[in-house]
Amino acid sequence: MNQKVMLVEKERFLLNDNCKYMITGRVSKEADIECYLDGIRLPSEANLITVMTGFMRAVETKNPGGKWVEVLVTLPENLQNYKKLQVYAVNGKERFLWYKMKTSDLMRKQGKPQLFVDGESIVREQKKVILAGWAVGTTPVSLQVYDENKKPVKITLKRNTRMDVAEMFRECEVNKDCGFHIQAENVSGKKAYLVAKDENGKKAVYQIGISKGERFKAKASLYSKKAMENYRSNGIHTVIRKSLIKLEALSKGDGLYQTWLKENRVTKKELNQQRKTVFRENIKFSLVVPLYKTDKYLLKALVDSVLAQTYSNWELCLSDGSGADSPIRSILEEYQKKDPRIKVVFNEKQLQISDNTNAAIGIATGNYIAFADHDDTLAEEAFYQMAKEISQHPEADLIYSDEDIIDIRGNRLFPHFKPDFNPDYLCCVNYICHLVVVKRTLLDRTGLLRPEYDGSQDFDFLLRCTEHTDSEKIRHIPKILYHWRSHEGSTAGNPDDKPYAVIAGEKALAGHYERMGIKAEVEYTGCPVVFRTRFVIEGDPKVSILIPNKDHTEDLNKCVTSILERSTWKNIQIIVIENNSEKEETFHYYEELEKRYSQAKVVTWDGPFNYSAINNFGAKYADGDYLLLLNNDTEVITPEWLENMMGYCQREDVGIVGAKLLYPDNTVQHAGVVVGIAGFAGHILTGYDRYATGYLWRLATTQDESAVTGACLMVKRSVFEELHGLDESFAVGLNDIDFCLRARALGKLVVFTPEACLYHYESKSRGLENTPEKKARLQKEVDHFRERYRDFLKKGDPYYNPNLSIVRGDCAFRMAYEKKDEIV
């Protein structure tokens, strides 16, 4: 057996059975699993895992050849009479000790609620503790914070939905609102405790370090406990191997970025040419940076990156919020003497981030204001590229760039290749982030940063900026012009380790909707700094669902039943469009369907198969305010799917909304369409796990897209009529993409939301394109699409990024071998 592939990732008891113990990990492909308690064989079952997490994929990439399994061991009730559980990977006479655990350790885990803290923040001056995480049990779980004397303290508790957690516990139904945000007040002493308690009195406890010493001890205790559990279970070699696998997997992924950098790095010749370039416009950048006891090495790196700029009309405005005894005062005074473009305001009082940034803005004289953090750096061409963009688009009010992350040594990692301005994406997560440049006139209209939003002050500021300008005046430069430092304590290092930022972000987004006059509820998703919006539906609009069908009554019945029995929205009309069915039982089913459901109606299309014409025909019988095109091989998962789609579709600026579609194995089939992939259009991030977040949260966030699939597509009736329905020259393929692009040409947004989720048993509607005739028909429509949208294809999809692959659909980096002219 290949012992190098052996690995245990996690273990736990089933919530609803104290005798069922589950172990998840990796073994060699040929291995079977055997479980023993003090040498006595235990009943167990090992199930193959086919849908892998990101970590599992990384391990497979680095070290292929194993299989991932979920082992369920049945333990005796009298566990106290035994000493040790041992689990072996077995192949013939070969045996490998895969996992072991003392029964005393097992018994400590039995029957308790599951408690996990994603992040914690300690505000010592205010005696405040902020916690974020999740807790589940077989009965409702209460949460309370206690001080070091075990006395309860006042808390504000907010629950949030964590579908990713609910999916983990498949053995029983758990509360999907198992996520939490807790703000505890007046927490004194050196430590505190978060206690999760179920209705049976069983407790799980998380220790919170308040003082710096206790925080260190608490973290050290947690890490050492995990390491010792791993050591006892797997041995020191497995502990080391697991750590190395994680590091090497990351290194391998980063290696692709290093290759991309070599192929795309700006040359010295180009930098020299930039220095010689003179723009007619008077563009002066003021880079404002709040400082607080900044590490001198990091401060030097920042200042040096500004001094190295190829565009010279800038000023660096620094505000030292360290207070009267600032440890960096002398070095800042030296910088001021070194270059008159470096300006510093020294503050006698310590300042928080917003007030500190505002102080820097107060000394800025540029007509464009740029923002940076005190431990980050700029690319050498940052200001040049910004000036070039402004010169070409002088109407621009706000410009942002791509960015990557650098570690403490300056190694470049994890590029953020962003889309062009995407307002619905921004309302889920601050994807814009850095580098941001704002025209002074927009800043004056918007106002300064607001201290009450500290932690998400930049998110609040960006949202307010969008309220005071037009979308066309927000520009994106698809170049990496900013390097975001990742180290302990930075948001780049762990964005979810600052729950106060989440609370401020939620407040900022709610305020944005209120100012815009939009009725909506905002909720944190549990995914780091990602929010979801629930719009209030206006009135009681009807949704007419159009379902083309040819035979396949079993699929159709599953689809219709799921709509009418699972949907929480009840004002529904279902129009089944019969087209060329051949089986007699199909027509018997239609009769039964109309008798069973008053909302259902069957109409007959007599012509040859033409998806566009069939839906246009069905739409004539619809009397809904919204039309929803739906394949017959779909099944509703999310009960609130229609509300979530209508919430966006009812907005004046939105024309079309698409849903997240899954294969039956709970992997992604559709999460938006990128126009240009494979030379015409394609889905992205297919095959990822249902709850994976995807590249830059693309699977977990609502976004504006160029197109969505017609397998589940909602459109305003007025927009459908203005477009005269689907274009019937696209009989089989690309009719949905063409429909979306024509809606965008009307100035309407096309929105993808993962909050509406369905299964899609793809291709059952009409079969695969697997005959020469069908392939020729599809190719003809592809050629037609390419000709119609030639200019769009050349420019590239604005909601994608030219640095990402248009050959693959997994948001891989676009390498030199991808030549656009060979594809379009």
Predicted features by range, described:
Residues 442, 452-480, 509, 641-645, ...:
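A short, conserved alpha-helix in the catalytic core of glycosyltransferases
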Residues 230-305, 510-565:
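N-proximal low-complexity "stem/linker" segments adjacent to membrane-targeting elements
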Residues 347-364, 605-622:
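Glycine-rich, basic loop-to-helix element that forms the pyrophosphate-binding segment
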Residues 369, 627:
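Short aromatic/hydrophobic "clamp" motif used to bind/position activated sugar donors
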Residues 320-330, 349, 373, 578-589, ...:
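A conserved acidic beta->alpha catalytic loop
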Residues 1-238, 278-282, 300, 529, ...:
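Basic, ligand-binding patches in group-transfer machinery
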Residues 303-313, 392, 561-571:
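Short, acidic, metal-binding catalytic loop of nucleotide-sugar glycosyltransferases
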Residues 381-413, 487, 634-680:
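Conserved donor NDP-sugar-binding/catalytic core segment of glycosyltransferases
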